[in-house]
Amino acid sequence: MFKNVLFPVDQSREAREAAEVVVNIVQQYGSHLVLLSVVEVPAPGEEPPQASPMTSPEAIAELLKTAQTLFTERGVQAQTLEREGKPAFVICDVADEIDADLIVMGCRGLGLTEEGASESVTTRVINLSPCPVLVVP
């Protein structure tokens, strides 16, 4: 059912909590797991993100290594990908590239305001994704 599962990772608590769900899905369905981390690059004329560790390729590489180790310890093999760009767009592009059957994401809970909902990477992925998205609260 879920042959290819994409799990975008960052340094958030929500991503760590969603990892347990990913392990269960991958083990239950014998899925191929792809871990993705995105180095956020500002658009021309846009301010760079405020001192975010997600803008450093070195920090991203370390994050992916740590995530891969976490899954390996649970008996799950994972492929890692590092990309640059706007997270929501990159996540959807990679899902299309790898023919993902499911994207699993944590949810940060930016609030019920219209602005918070529209700015959420998760919301954008849900709206743009070429496959189902499982949001782990």
Give the role of each language-model region:
Residues N24, D93-P137:
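Gly/Ser-rich helix-loop-strand patches that form or flank binding pockets
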Residues S31-H32, V76, A100, C131:
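Short glycine/serine/threonine/alanine-rich loop segments
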Residues V34, Q79, L134:
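Conserved beta-strand positions in the Rossmann-like core of class I SAM-dependent methyltransferases
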Residues T69-I103:
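Structural beta-alpha unit
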Residues P42-A43, A88, L112:
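Generic structural signal for helix capping and beta-alpha/helix-loop junctions
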Residues P48, S52-E62:
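A short acidic, glycine-rich active-site loop
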Residues K3-P49:
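Small/aliphatic-rich secondary-structure junction motif
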